[in-house]
Amino acid sequence: MKKNLIIGIICYVITGVLTILFLATSVSVKLIMPELEKVIVLCVASIFTYFGGRFLTKYHNSKKYMKISIWVMFILYLLLLINFIVLGNNFGRNFEFIFTASKDTIKSYFDNNYNIIPFNTIKNYLDNSGIYFDIKLVCINLLGNLLCFMPFAFFLKYLFKRENKFINFLLTIVLIVIFFELIQLLTLSGSFDVDDIILNTLGAILFYLFISLKGIDKLLKNIFFLEKNKINGKD
């Protein structure tokens, strides 16, 4: 039915509009949007992307549109991650600093914004929470680092067959996390912290193991790839 085609296209158009809004508020100094609202915008965009894929799948009788939708969601997630890690002013990021800082300032920044001692930052947070650090901010920081790379588990597992082997996924996610940590340091928008690498990687691993459970795996394939797997109590 043409109705499915029209609705599918409308969903994708709405996704495009919301993505443009997100990008505009991320790079413009005049258009400012709180980080939570940016998350909501891209979550809504992802929902429209999903249903766009479903309606186009019904119209064309081809599941490839669902995979396209998952790829679009992956791109939206990457945009959100880049915003938080490099561009997010609400998180103390100052990407423009790299263009105005002197060589001495840059050298000093590199010298003072890295930690290669495992659990040093985490221990510092826990020991000084409520004294030098707000407990709420400590929880947000630690929990945020644990959660923010979890979606990679889903996207890597279901978009790349190679990542269905745990050892391949582990190597990939470690490299990705290290890459983002280096980007923060090299753009002067954050620090390189081995504790962030530990938390980011741990979160992704835990979620990967969770979605690899037989019943959860079948459920996700039914939802996102429109498979018709039977799920029983033993799964």
List each model region and its residues:
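Active-site scaffold segments
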Residues: E181-Q184, D196, N200
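Alpha-helical transmembrane segments of multi-pass membrane proteins
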Residues: L146, M150, I197-A204
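Bulky hydrophobic segments
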Residues: M1-L188, Y208-D235
